[in-house]
Every structure is written in C-alpha cells, then in structure tokens.
C-alpha cells in the first residue's frame, strides 16, 4: 500500500487511539511489523515516560490548558521512542480536526518526524496550510461520505493538493462517529454501502487510495474491502488486545471483560455520538455522581470551554486521561463494536500474522 511517497508492506493502518492508547510502543511495533503505526496526538501531556527535561504544567493532576494537553515536547519524545523501535519505517500521527490548536499540533507532529498525518472529527478543509514547510508529509483525511471527500478536494485546490489517501470510516468504529445517532444503525450508512461512492469520487480527482475503517476485525474483513476496490484498511480496537498497546492493563481488562451488549453509543462533548464500553462512568452520569466538569485542559473547540461537557455530564479530556491511567471507576473506555471479541492479549507480531495470513 502506497500513501504519498511511503510504501507500507501490509495494507493495514493501526488507527489512532487517544488518550495514550496508541503511543510509542504500539505504533512503533505496528510499523516494525509492516503495518502503519499511528501515534495519537491527543493528550500527550499525560505521557507517563516523559524525560525530566520536559515540563508539563499540571492542575489537579491534569495537563493545564491547550499547550500542556497537546504538548509539543511530549509528542516529540513519543515519536523519538517509537523510532527506537521502528527506525525509519513510515510512522503517522492522528490529529482530530475538532481540537483547539489544530494547526500548531499538525506542525508539531511534522517537526517530531511524522511521515503521514491522519485527520478526522471534522472536515479538514485547510489541512495543507499547516504542512507547507513539510512537502514530504502525506495528508490523509477521514470521511464518512463521498460528499465530504468532494468538499475536501475542492477546498484543497487552492493549495494545489489532493489527499494522499482517504479513510472512509463506517459507523461501527470506536470513539466518535461521523454520523447522527440514528444513522449509525441504518443499512445505507454501513461501511460496505458508503465505500463504493467514495471510491468513485476518488477517481474524479486522480488516483487517491481509499482505505476502509470501522468494524474491521480479521483477514476475511480485510480481503472483503480490498475486493471492493480499497487499497487497505484501518483498524484500531483489535490492537488494544496486544502486549505492546500503551493502554494501562486495567484498560485492556475492561475490554477483555466486556460483553457485546456493553459496547454502546453515547453522547460526547464533541457533539457527535461516540462508541465505548458502558462502565461505572455511564451509571454515575445517570445518577449525577460523575466527577465535576471543570475544563482544565480546554481540549476540543466544539465543547466550548466545558459548556457541552456540562450538558452531557462529563469532560472528555479528564475521562480519557483517567482511562489511560487505568481508573476503571471514572475512566471513559472507547471501543469499536467488535471490542468484546478480544479474549486474550497477544503480541503485535502475532496479530499482524493473523491479519495477513489468517487464523
């Protein structure tokens, strides 16, 4: 699979997962094993392995404000540590369009050594503006419709740029969805039904590789989407079930213990439905006993400094940060719809073999 000038041995992208689920260990090992490892740029101020020379200003154990939550120095150290594992193999960063300081974080990732930038959670109409000084960095938006791809390609004409690849994410993915709540369950929005129009649209703009995401689990799924005309797939949740995944062991236990009915869609301060495991947090929100929303990190623009968080009953930065630390009581545990299928922890090497050779 080729993205921009980068050749990836296997047609598998490990999806970005934040806070702290896909950092140096997971992304580094996926790239080492021939996939594309993706470092999440969200919440880097929480990184547990910071060197003493990086100073993160904390308030109540949480990174204070945007500069600390999206720490440039921490992101650089995460990339450096991943490079110790995968050397010069392609490595990507996932940066949500909805974050505060999007442009700055894109530049930070380029400076840190990202070869590819992947962006979802919004339509990144001005993404190329922030990579002008990094012409070798490949740009990959995530879309949920042909219409969104068309809009991006039109807007990018002013930069004389088309996407180096496009990821089409269906409504079975973990975390935020590009669909209204009720549309997540409709036949017409299933990944296999939205992918073909995107492939057709991509042909109108040149040879843009199309990558399928959302509910991909095994080699059978990968083969199916490649037969539909995709260049590859992006999958995230299954990589949580690896030793190398940067998540706390207690985070992995939440998925190991989850049943199919525990994985649900929920409201999010970002204003989109989000999929995760129903844990104590959801019950405490219903009972009004969840941790108080204080907006310490100011993480995402749509939340409007905690306004939306107060409406839905939780702060997404704080709760994802808690999950990264292994706090099962107050953490938010995002998962794709297949997360309950994780039944044991294996190595990235073994998982990549299952995905490429079958199991």
What are the residue ranges of the model-derived segments?
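Conserved active-site-proximal phosphate/metal-binding subdomains
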Residues: 13, 173-211, 217-359
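Active-site entrance/lid segments in N-terminal catalytic domains of soluble metabolic enzymes
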Residues: 1-205
């Amino acid at each position: 699979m080729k993205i921009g000038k980068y050749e990836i041995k296997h047609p598998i992208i490990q999806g970005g997962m934040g806070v702290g689920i896909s950092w140096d260990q997971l992304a580094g090992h996926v790239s080492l094993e021939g996939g594309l490892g993706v470092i999440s740029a969200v919440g880097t101020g929480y990184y547990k392995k910071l060197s003493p020379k990086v100073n993160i200003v904390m308030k109540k154990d949480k990174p204070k404000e945007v500069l600390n939550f999206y720490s440039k120095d921490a992101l650089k150290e995460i990339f450096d540590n991943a490079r110790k594992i995968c050397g010069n193999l392609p490595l990507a960063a996932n940066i949500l369009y909805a974050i505060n300081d999007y442009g700055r974080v894109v530049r930070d990732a380029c400076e840190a050594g990202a070869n590819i930038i992947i962006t979802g959670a919004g339509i990144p109409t001005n993404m190329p503006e922030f990579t002008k000084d990094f012409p070798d960095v490949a740009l990959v938006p995530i879309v949920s419709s042909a219409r969104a791809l068309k809009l991006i390609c039109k807007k990018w004409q002013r930069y004389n740029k088309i996407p180096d690849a496009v990821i089409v994410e269906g409504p079975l993915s973990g975390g935020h969805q590009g669909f209204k709540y009720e549309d997540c369950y409709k036949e017409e929005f299933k990944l296999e039904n939205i992918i073909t129009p995107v492939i057709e649209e991509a042909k109108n703009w040149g040879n843009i590789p199309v990558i399928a995401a959302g509910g991909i689990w095994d080699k059978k799924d990968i083969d199916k989407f490649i037969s539909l005309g995709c260049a590859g797939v992006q999958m995230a949740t299954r990589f949580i079930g690896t030793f190398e995944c940067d998540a706390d062991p207690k985070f992995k236990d939440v998925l190991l213990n989850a049943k199919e009915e525990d994985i649900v869609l929920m409201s999010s301060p970002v204003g989109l439905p989000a999929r995760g495991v129903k844990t104590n947090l959801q019950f405490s929100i219903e009972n009004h006993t969840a941790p108080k929303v204080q907006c310490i990190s100011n993480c995402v623009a749509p939340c409007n400094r905690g306004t939306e968080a107060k409406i839905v009953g939780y702060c997404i930065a704080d709760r994802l940060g808690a999950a990264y630390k292994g706090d099962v009581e107050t953490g938010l545990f995002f998962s794709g719809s297949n997360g309950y299928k994780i039944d044991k922890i294996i190595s990235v090497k073994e998982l990549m073999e299952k995905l490429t050779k079958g199991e």
